[in-house]
């Protein structure tokens, strides 16, 4: 068999970065970038092996955040500012997992889009 060809991950030496947490009702995605916006590491609940309704749990968000933080710390990341977006269940647990992984959080910003009476919302579920 031929050896697997692909890009080798280049070790960057980055001290500060931005963590983008996108938390929807169905999944939680964590993207870690440098201050200019170039992606260093990313993870999501689905990428960590959770399927279906388990992706939307706080534990899945915690696992995804820990994984993304570990990947980013390989590049020398130490301090981060956090940008949280969305109404999902994994917002707070992802933040706790980032600080537990050893990243120093300097700023937390909530950029959840709020409509000023925009589109009509989806109808209520009747179970």
Swiss-Prot record:
Q: Tell me what this protein is called.
A: Small ribosomal subunit protein uS11
Function according to Swiss-Prot or TrEMBL: Located on the platform of the 30S subunit, it bridges several disparate RNA helices of the 16S rRNA. Forms part of the Shine-Dalgarno cleft in the 70S ribosome.
The answer to whether UniProt assigns keyword Cell membrane to this entry is no
Q: Does the keyword Disulfide bond apply?
A: no
Protein family (similarity comment):
Belongs to the universal ribosomal protein uS11 family.
Q: Which UniProt keyword terms apply here?
A: Ribonucleoprotein, Ribosomal protein, RNA-binding, rRNA-binding
| Quaternary context | Part of the 30S ribosomal subunit. Interacts with proteins S7 and S18. Binds to IF-3.
BP GO terms, sorted: translation
What InterPro entries does the annotation carry?
A: Ribosomal_uS11, Ribosomal_uS11_bac-type, Ribosomal_uS11_CS, Ribosomal_uS11_sf
Gene Ontology MF term list:
rRNA binding; structural constituent of ribosome
Q: Which GO terms describe its cellular component?
A: ribonucleoprotein complex; ribosome
Name of the coding gene = rpsK
Q: Which PANTHER family match?
A: 40S RIBOSOMAL PROTEIN S14/30S RIBOSOMAL PROTEIN S11 (PTHR11759)
Per its UniProt entry, which superkingdom is the organism in?
Answer: Bacteria
């Amino acid at each position: 068999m031929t050896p697997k060809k692909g890009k080798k991950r280049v070790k960057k030496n980055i001290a500060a970065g931005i963590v983008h947490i996108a938390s929807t009702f169905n999944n939680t995605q964590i993207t870690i970038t440098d201050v200019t916006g170039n992606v260093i590491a990313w993870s999501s609940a689905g990428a960590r092996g959770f399927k279906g309704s388990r992706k939307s749990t706080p534990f899945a968000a915690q696992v995804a955040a820990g994984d993304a933080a570990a990947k980013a710390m390989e590049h020398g990341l130490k301090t981060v500012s956090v940008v949280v977006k969305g109404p999902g269940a994994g917002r707070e647990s992802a933040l706790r997992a980032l600080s537990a992984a050893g990243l120093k959080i300097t700023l937390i910003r909530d950029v959840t889009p709020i409509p000023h009476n925009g589109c009509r919302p989806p109808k209520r579920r009747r179970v």
